[in-house]
UniProtKB/Swiss-Prot annotation:
It comes from Homo sapiens (Human). This is Olfactory receptor 4N4C. Disulfide bonds join 97-179. Belongs to the G-protein coupled receptor 1 family. The lineage of its organism: Eukaryota, Metazoa, Chordata, Craniata, Vertebrata. GO terms for cellular component: plasma membrane.
């Protein structure tokens, strides 16, 4: 344990996902393959939406931002986790821990708010189609984007300020593979009851409200679609049902992690792995690859790239 002369902890030791070498190797290989396949897919989504002038509807602005948020989010935990699998001593500095914690909550909070905005966009498009062009105009869309980024920033700053005010005088072992509020506050050498209540209010309540708001929005949309007699009824119901499943998969672990910070549970690490590494990589792919316009544009983009490569090879 490394502690400075003033008894302030300057680094944390990450105990990792598991102590079993065989399981570590298996998880390392799976996450590396998963990361190398799906992460480029997120950047392809961003590039496709940015390069196609036909994808200008608010939905595509939100899908592009979702891919950017999740690609950025995956950079916070996964690369370091992969490096730590190969290291005997898994150490992160105090400043590095605070930085990781800040970006986790900045991007995670922003993404939760973005999903709420996307649900509102679908509600307007399906239930109030005549008002879509006036309500979801470019100015309103960019204002919503600014608001969700600011919301994520404020949420994260509150978390960081609460952590920075805590004294850490040892021990310095975090029973996880990354730095997060739930594990860090357990190491503070002071009474944590009030701080944990504030954490529940900031993270847990925000997560729960986003979750309930999303479920309510899609419940209203599904009820409206069921009563409608349009050609796209089945497609709209399928899309909404898929998004509800995604919301359950995303917010279930988040609620599990942040609504009950007072006790450690056996499933904590696996839930954290799913929440911080696996789902952020899958999320934009699931949302976007159900959109026919994006898939068509992506195929055209890849076809042009292949043609250019073949032409370059022939000329040289």
């Amino acid at each position: 344990m490394k502690i400075a002369n003033n008894t302030v902890v300057t680094e944390f030791i990450l105990l990792g996902l598991t102590q079993s070498q065989d399981i570590q190797l298996l998880v390392f290989v799976l996450i590396l393959i998963f990361y190398l396949i799906i992460l480029p897919g997120n950047f392809l989504i961003i590039f496709t939406i940015r390069s196609d002038p036909g994808l200008t509807a608010p939905l595509y602005l939100f899908l592009g931002n979702l891919a950017f948020l999740d690609a950025s989010y995956s950079f916070i935990v996964a690369p370091r986790m992969l490096v730590d699998f190969l290291s005997e001593k898994k150490v992160i500095s105090y400043r590095g821990c605070i930085t990781q914690l800040f970006f986790l909550h900045f991007l995670g909070g922003g993404e939760g708010l973005l999903l709420v905005v996307m649900a509102f966009d679908r509600y307007i498009a399906i239930c109030r189609p005549l008002h879509c062009s006036t309500v979801m105009n470019p100015r309103a869309c960019y204002a919503m984007m600014l608001a969700l980024w600011l919301g994520g920033f404020v949420h994260s700053i509150i978390q960081v300020v609460l952590i920075l005010r805590l004294p850490f005088c040892g021990p310095n072992q975090l029973d996880n593979f990354f730095c997060d509020v739930r594990q860090v506050i357990k190491l503070a050498c002071t009474d944590m009851f009030v701080v944990e209540l504030l954490m529940v209010f900031n993270s847990g309540l925000m997560t729960l409200l986003c979750f309930l708001g999303l479920l309510a929005s899609y419940a209203v949309i599904l009820c409206h679609v069921r009563r409608a007699a349009s050609e796209g009824k089945n497609k709209a119901m399928s899309t909404c049902t898929t998004r509800v499943i995604i919301i359950l998969l995303m917010f279930g672990p988040a609620i599990f992690i942040y609504i009950c910070p007072f006790r450690a549970l056996p499933a904590d690490k696996m839930v954290s792995l799913f929440h911080t590494v696996i789902f952020p990589l899958m999320n934009p792919m699931i949302y976007t690859l159900r959109n026919q316009e994006v898939k068509t544009s992506m195929k055209r983009l890849l076809s042009r790239h292949v043609v250019c490569q073949v032409d370059f090879i022939i000329r040289n």
